[in-house]
Amino acid sequence: MKVVEIKHPMVKHKLGLMRALAISTQEFRRLTKEITSLLTYEVTAGFELEKTEILGWQGENIEVDQIKGKKLTVVPILRAGLGMMDGVFEHVPAAKVSMVGMYRDENTAKPVAYFAKLCDKLDERVALIVDPMLATGGSMIETVTLLKKAGSKDIKIITLVSAPEGIEALANAHPDVELYTASIDSHLNEKKYIIPGLGDAGDKIFGTK
């Protein structure tokens, strides 16, 4: 599995701000969007270009570069993934949205699916899954499995922080996906939370406890 940890200074700086205990909901939400935007820029760096003819500003036909045949659906894992969508839309405003509801049972740490609304022609689209945390990998593995069953063939993932345990589990289950993350953190604690992590990203994005 391709794993890319984005080590750009702006990404690391913004992520460092997000780790603070006293961070406000507004600030956490803003930084989530900004980091997602920077990571999306990295994800799309591998997209192929082709020449297209357009009518230029002087009224004459000119050749310009355009992304070649790429259709994209952004797939937020509810609910925390919703906070990352605007960061993707800054670069791909026409992206279709496919939503997957997946939560982690706090007692068993196992994923539980409760919702899926996917766009059409998944076999023709890049599916970009967004979720702030890759902890055990369970929810992400189930989401990828769901997308593949629906026809997805090209799946990329953006997370803010990832645990080594989750990366290993995801790689074993789906070695053909690509993971882009702002940080590979140290480990999972006994409650399966990422250390040092961000705490509960969903609660911090939506201002709930």
Curated annotation (Swiss-Prot):
Query: Record-annotated residues binding 5-phospho-alpha-D-ribose 1-diphosphate?
Result: 79, 104, 131-139, 200
Does the record carry Ubl conjugation as a key word?
A: no
Report the superkingdom from the record: Bacteria
Pfam families, sorted: UPRTase (PF14681)
* Example of a GO MF term: uracil phosphoribosyltransferase activity
InterPro entries associated with the record? PRibTrfase_dom (IPR000836), PRTase-like (IPR029057), Upp_B (IPR034332), UPRTase/APRTase (IPR050054), Ura_phspho_trans (IPR005765)
Q: Which residues form a coiled coil?
A: none
What does the record give as the reaction this protein catalyses?
UMP + diphosphate = 5-phospho-alpha-D-ribose 1-diphosphate + uracil
Q: What CDD domains does the entry give? A: PRTases_typeI
Record-listed uracil binding positions: 194, 199-201
Cofactor entry: Mg(2+)
> Which family would the database say this protein is a member of?
Belongs to the UPRTase family.
Its biological purpose: Catalyzes the conversion of uracil and 5-phospho-alpha-D-ribose 1-diphosphate (PRPP) to UMP and diphosphate.
Name-wise, this protein is Uracil phosphoribosyltransferase
Question: Which lineage do the record's taxonomy fields give for this organism?
Answer: Bacteria, Pseudomonadati, Pseudomonadota, Gammaproteobacteria, Thiotrichales
